[in-house]
From Swiss-Prot:
Gene this protein is translated from: hoxd1
Cell division found in the keyword field: no
GO cellular component terms listed in the entry, alphabetical order: nucleus
Keyword DNA-binding in annotation: yes
Name the record gives this protein: Homeobox protein Hox-D1
Ranges for region Disordered: 148-168, 251-300
Source organism per UniProt: Xenopus laevis
Record PROSITE patterns: HOMEOBOX_1, HOMEOBOX_2
Pfam family name, one: Homeodomain
Amino acid sequence: MNSYLEYTSCGDVLAFSPKFCRSDHRNMNLQPYPRSGADHSFMPVGGVPGSVAHQAPHQSPALYAPCSLDVAYEPTPPSDYSFLHSSPDYDYYGSNHQIEETGGHIPYGSSLFPGNGSYILNGQLSYRTLGEETQMAQCKEPLEVYPGGNLQSISPSPGTYPKPASPASDSYVSTFDWMKVKRNPPKKSIPSEYGVTSPPCNVRTNFTTKQLTELEKEFHFNKYLTRARRIEIANSLQLNDTQVKIWFQNRRMKQKKREREGTLPNSPPSGPASNFCVKPPHLKSVNETATLSPSKDASP
């Protein structure tokens, strides 16, 4: 209360400061009453019986009945304090309100607080804003104020959701052939009995037509490649050394398989071993045939 009320001491009379009161205010006179020694307390005039005011200082302090503060204010604000607006929500209280004997609340109002409140004499403070009253009033309204049509416009019915296009509809996009290719998922590495996991299988290399043509041309002349030649071909075809090496291994196995099946004639070996020519049987020398066949002159 000291932060909102300022008193001006004039001898034995205390009056409210004009900072809190309006232009036409009434002074509330208080009489000093000595309680013990230098302690002084002020009681309103007529609030305490005369017998209690003349008690001896050495007696124990008596309990006093609750008193009422009657201060009247003008409804219109003064010209000096134009920042205080006169409204039902922000008007000062106290002109026609008295202290409640049961609860002991002093209603107050101020422009610093945007609402109505009450000060409790025992040190507690209860405060309630106008917004809470409005929210409570809105909660008490029935839910029937919202028509059924508005609720349906907010949340659509279950049958109004759009359905995806079916394959039989015209708007369904046709699937291309390249979209139908099934690719096998990569195989997971299986741990061995010693706990060592084998590396996963490498992805199969898809060679282009140009790469296959160049590799077949090289295989026609040389079925076995040196490391230098293998690296040279790999760089020219944008491949690595391992890919060229594996392709030549597979190509040689394919060639041998065809020869065993008889689809291809036996071709002379290519490479360094091809320099050694083998003589056909009809070109053998006479001496070789004579030594192999028995002589006619030999006796039995």
